[in-house]
Amino acid sequence: MVSTMMNEQQQGGMTHGYNVEALKNKPKSKPGKATDTCLEVSDLQLWYGQDKVLKGVDMEIPRGRITAFIGPSGCGKSTLLRCFNRMNDLIDNCRIEGHIRIDGEDIYDRRVDIPELRRRVGMVFQKPNPFPKSIYENVAYGLRLQGVRNRRVLDEVVERSLKRAALWDEVKDRLHENALGLSGGQQQRLVIARAVAVEPEVLLLDEPASALDPLATLKIEELMFELKEEYTIAIVTHNMQQAARVSDYTAFMYLGELVEFNDTDTLFTTPAKKQTEDYITGRYG
């Protein structure tokens, strides 16, 4: 049993893979909050050329929760995440079969407005990618693309979005300075502010803290707890401590297959599959 192995491997609350205390101390979701399905994935298969990368993935991602995707490098985590807003469409020789539905709508239907889909499903990448513009213009960028020109509206949305991203107090007196002058952690929170400014339903975070120092990582994690009150969040992480700390649900992937998907506490303490147990206890990966 995993619990037995944890006792053997524990050193100051740590296992090879993650901190078991994180499960005890993690803020819990508010009771009574809806847990209906936001994203439904059915028999999803994906090829890059002749290379089959995703192999019949089936899952339902609950609304208003944080779902973490873990697994060794190359297992298909990020590829799956990019399917949720069709970023893989930009890759040559990519072919997809199966279905992904948001609120019952198949996002791979040919009638889907892809720019609108990417507004509804925002994405933040591993490396912060602010535009070489002012802090203000970074946040206002998506609104301007939508045709918003009213300065009062822009001001309100910029302030609200920066507050949501826990960045307002740090930048409110320098909004017209170049965003590239911010620290790495501030840049990543700015990118999150830019994403939430257009009022998405889902936020996809692909290793959002892997390039940041521990303090900046903590701020990103605290921000995720706050944002899940308004958005459904899916995060890819190689850091199992982070998955245990921040997520409500965890999906373990291996070689393009979804091996196990369960609430985080259960998956990390009593996994149903031996592959999952081996991975979270450091036997491979």
Curated annotation (Swiss-Prot):
ATP binds at residues 71-78. CDD domains: ABC_PstB_phosphate_transporter (cd03260). It is found in: Cell inner membrane. GO terms for cellular component: plasma membrane. It catalyses: phosphate(out) + ATP + H2O = ADP + 2 phosphate(in) + H(+). Its EC number is 7.3.2.1. It is an enzyme of class 7 (translocase). Coiled coil: none annotated. One of its GO terms (biological process) is phosphate ion transmembrane transport. It comes from the Bacteria. It holds the Pfam family ABC_tran. Keywords: ATP-binding, Cell inner membrane, Cell membrane, Membrane, Nucleotide-binding, Phosphate transport, Translocase, Transport. One of its GO terms (molecular function) is ATPase-coupled phosphate ion transmembrane transporter activity. The keyword RNA-binding does not apply. Residues 39-280 form the ABC transporter domain. SUPFAM superfamilies: P-loop containing nucleoside triphosphate hydrolases. The keyword ATP-binding applies. It is a peripheral membrane protein. The complex is composed of two ATP-binding proteins (PstB), two transmembrane proteins (PstC and PstA) and a solute-binding protein (PstS). Part of the ABC transporter complex PstSACB involved in phosphate import. Responsible for energy coupling to the transport system. Belongs to the ABC transporter superfamily. Phosphate importer (TC 3.A.1.7) family. This is Phosphate import ATP-binding protein PstB. It comes from Alkalilimnicola ehrlichii (strain ATCC BAA-1101 / DSM 17681 / MLHE-1).
